[in-house]
Amino acid sequence: MTLQQEIIQALGAKPHINPEEEIRRSVDFLKAYLKTYPFLKSLVLGISGGQDSTLAGKLSQMAIAELREETGDNALQFIAVRLPYGVQADEQDCQDAIAFIQPDRVLTVNIKGAVLASEQALREAGIELSDFVRGNEKARERMKAQYSIAGMTHGVVVGTDHAAEAITGFFTKYGDGGTDINPLHRLNKRQGKQLLAALGCPEHLYKKVPTADLEDDRPSLPDEAALGVTYDNIDDYLEGKTLDPAIAKTIEGWYVKTEHKRRLPITVFDDFWKR
């Protein structure tokens, strides 16, 4: 088995999908989890205004609405959380995403004060954060807020991770990567767009340039610029296509380098890191 085949198998990626079937698969998956643990009453997700959170949010709201109708349990709710750092540059996209999702409840938690307070506490301890590490601090603060909300609403935190993100480890460890349940796992980036198109999402929400927008020194840095490859390259790789060897090597390099992000904390029984 080649490394490409190994990666495709590990991430559950497929070269072709039926969008309607995958929508139903994700919604049923979320419903089944909540039905298995009936003490759970909410799904919680941060909404950024980008493709991934818009899709995960819509699927979550659909799951909650169906389950509420099927069970008669009106305590069930989907909570969309806005988590700006100060004022978000693409705030209108966030509002458009909320309008599309139609969540049961919307909360806004501005994380800037908490991030700055944490940075100051570290500074007083003699640690000065780099801009890159501060970006990770933002991602972790966002996740901390979501878990607090989930804890107070008997909920689980929904993730936005998908195959095209997982393969490169393009997420913050214990930040946006630290979630309870990931309904998009297996899909690549272009397949996520197909699901949103099938759901009637406004095109600008899934055709915009993807950006994590975590760094102050490089605001709105495109994901593709940070990775050195395009999402089309990554999707082609996940679909089993043959790529330019240099591009394939870059993608595989990211996969190997970030393997620790896709695993539980390393123990004496692990040897993947020796690869």
From Swiss-Prot:
Upper taxonomic lineage: Bacteria, Pseudomonadati, Pseudomonadota, Gammaproteobacteria, Enterobacterales
Pathway: Cofactor biosynthesis; NAD(+) biosynthesis; NAD(+) from deamido-NAD(+) (ammonia route): step 1/1
One GO term describing the cellular component: cytoplasm
Similarity field: Belongs to the NAD synthetase family.
SUBUNIT field: Homodimer.
Gene name of the encoded protein: nadE
Chain sites annotated for binding ATP: 46-53, 160, 189, 211
Positions bound to deamido-NAD(+): 33, 140, 173, 180, 260-261
Protein name, as recorded: NH(3)-dependent NAD(+) synthetase
UniProt superkingdom: Bacteria
EC numbers, comma separated: 6.3.1.5
